[in-house]
Amino acid sequence: MTHKKQKKEMSDSEKKTFNEDSKHSILAVDLVRLILERLSFVDFHRARCVSSIWYIASKTVIGVTNPTTPWLILFPKGDVEIKKDSCKLYDPHENKTYIVRDLGFDLVTSRCLASSGSWFLMLDHRTEFHLLNLFTRVRIPLPSLESTRGSDIKIGNAVLWVDEQRKDYLVVWNISSLFGYHKKGDDRWKVFKPLENERCIIAMVFKENKLYVLSVDGNVDVFYFSGNDSPVRCATLPSSPLRKGHKVVVTLSGEVLIIVAKVEPYPRTRLCFFAVYKMDPKSSRWETIKSLAGEALILDLGITVEAKVMKNCIYFSNDQFHRYNENSLWNVSNKSGVFVYHFRSANVVQLVELLTASSRTSKILFKDARCFFPTFTSKWLL
């Protein structure tokens, strides 16, 4: 009888201790939430990784979502002698810049091929691929290309698709009309060559399990990726008469656009113009359109996004424009600038100011600005 009573008293004591610990945990979450609500977007997502309590508290903060305006990333220039493992991020919504330091590898000798959310597809020393998340600093090595085709390789285009909820990813690249792809879990690159009679590929974009391929012949071929099966060609759009300086884009509704970029021949102005073409379903011809239906076009990603303020605009960089059109816009000092092209303002290109040069606090010079949409829905893909 005494033993049972003592056992009951011990249980009551343990219950009291548990209740006190629960109150302290709730109090800690409330205090952390107050701190998180005062932080900027980047600091908020840094702080949520401090501990499990901070992560739990972050889920209760209302109004913090992934950005709907594209951010910009700039990589260090090739002539930099120090800090080659750092890059700069720019948030246009808050007009703030952030330098991500000590990533652990040389970004100067690496080449960024594509991005998906906060993940970047990097190619190092021409044959070594890896995925990099700048915020979590997770780096995922991919199979080397040396076993595929040797060291003399020049990647034409590449796309990256990442599903952070399912922890899945897909990488596709091309060399002329040869395609290579790698899915999570594969131990090597798989190769296919579906365009035997066509020349090199100009541009690619991946959306909703479909790879849209624009060839120099003006054809747009669509390939469907499903599970472990090989990609299957599911559509071919009529050939476009356009031959130079263009890119394929997929809109929010799934429509395919072809973008043609041109530079005014006057060296003092160096203004550019964009023509946007969409397939007319009745005539099966590519027709010019004058509006993006209130959406914004991200040339780097090959997609359109919903726009609340900067509607009917094209986001692009001078480095990117040179890659696609073999022409630069303004003078050399502005070659790393990022621009916004407005359809409704007499085809005027407006410069988005960036600190591409070094500052008092940083001696790093940056170049090659790219647009991306940061996401913080998951910690890693491994």
Curated annotation (Swiss-Prot):
Keyword line: Brassinosteroid signaling pathway, Cytoplasm, Kelch repeat, Nucleus, Repeat, Ubl conjugation pathway
Tissue: Expressed in seedlings, leaves, stems, flower buds and flowers.
Each Kelch repeat, start to end: 73-117, 159-209, 259-306
Gene inactivation effect: Abolished brassinosteroid (BR)-induced ASK7/BIN2/SK21 degradation, and severe BR-insensitivity. Suppression of the constitutive BR-response phenotype in the dominant mutant bzr1-1D, and accumulation of phosphorylated BZR1.
F-box domain: residues covered: 22-69
GO BP terms: brassinosteroid mediated signaling pathway; positive regulation of brassinosteroid mediated signaling pathway; protein ubiquitination; ubiquitin-dependent protein catabolic process
GO MF term set: ubiquitin protein ligase activity
Cited InterPro entries: F-box_BR-signaling (IPR050942), F-box_dom (IPR001810), Gal_Oxase/kelch_b-propeller (IPR011043), KIB1-4_b-propeller (IPR005174)
Subcellular location: Cytoplasm; Nucleus, Nucleolus
UniProt key word Repeat: yes
Superkingdom assignment: Eukaryota
GO cellular component assignments: cytoplasm; nucleolus; SCF ubiquitin ligase complex
Record bears the keyword Phosphoprotein: no
SUPFAM superfamilies: Galactose oxidase, central domain
PANTHER family in UniProt: F-BOX PROTEIN KIB2-RELATED, OS07G0183000 PROTEIN-RELATED
Assembly: Part of a SCF (SKP1-cullin-F-box) protein ligase complex. Binds directly to several GSK3 family proteins such as SKP1A/ASK1, ASK1/SK11, ASK3/SK12, ASK5/SK13, ASK7/BIN2/SK21, ASK9/SK22 and ASK6/SK23. Interacts with ASK7/BIN2/SK21 in a brassinosteroid (BR)-dependent manner.
Function: Component of SCF(ASK-cullin-F-box) E3 ubiquitin ligase complexes, which may mediate the ubiquitination and subsequent proteasomal degradation of target proteins. Required for brassinosteroid (BR) signal transduction. Mediates ASK7/BIN2/SK21 inactivation both by competing with substrate binding (e.g. BZR1) and by promoting its ubiquitination and subsequent proteasomal degradation.
UniProt-recorded name of the protein: F-box/kelch-repeat protein KIB1
Species this protein is from: Arabidopsis thaliana (Mouse-ear cress)
Taxonomic lineage from the root: Eukaryota, Viridiplantae, Streptophyta, Embryophyta, Tracheophyta
Name of the gene encoding the protein in the UniProt record: KIB1
